[in-house]
Amino acid sequence: MKLKLHHINLCSTNVEAMDRFYRDVLTLGDEKPSELPPLNQGKGLVGDVSFVTDGAIQMHLTPKDVLNSFKSGQVVNPLERGHIAYRTDDIEAFMKHLDEQGIPYSDWGSDAVKGWHQVFFYDPDGNVIEVHQIVNT
């Protein structure tokens, strides 16, 4: 079970302004279309998302949604304050590892992002962490 940093998600009430800031000030560019996840609008994500990159790590700029947990039925809300995300090659083994560590998590499956099995959980300070695996759907 390998883990690799995949993206940083920042939530905003103004995605367009955030996009301009990261492109103009930090000179980040577009993510390659082949690297972009297919989003399931209305199932976790609502609104436009911007994807920028430094060429190595993606940054997902998403609309802030403080009511996401109520809408999705999930305990962990990755769209309230954002999150950091890791990609794994074995999501089942990772969930078993979380169970063994006694860490509760929300299993989103592929509801929000088609082809990604996502789980979200909190670190000791309440920061949201995502771990996902690319899966066939």
What do these predicted ranges mean?
Residues 55-58, 125-127:
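Short acidic/polar mixed-charge low-complexity motifs
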Residues 35-40, 67-72, 107:
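A short, acidic/glycine-rich surface segment
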Residues 9-57:
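Core segments of cupin and vicinal oxygen chelate
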Residues 1-19, 32, 81-86, 136-137:
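N-terminal beta-strand motif that seeds the catalytic metal site of vicinal oxygen chelate
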Residues 6, 47, 116-117:
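Short loop/turn microsegments at loop-to-beta-strand junctions
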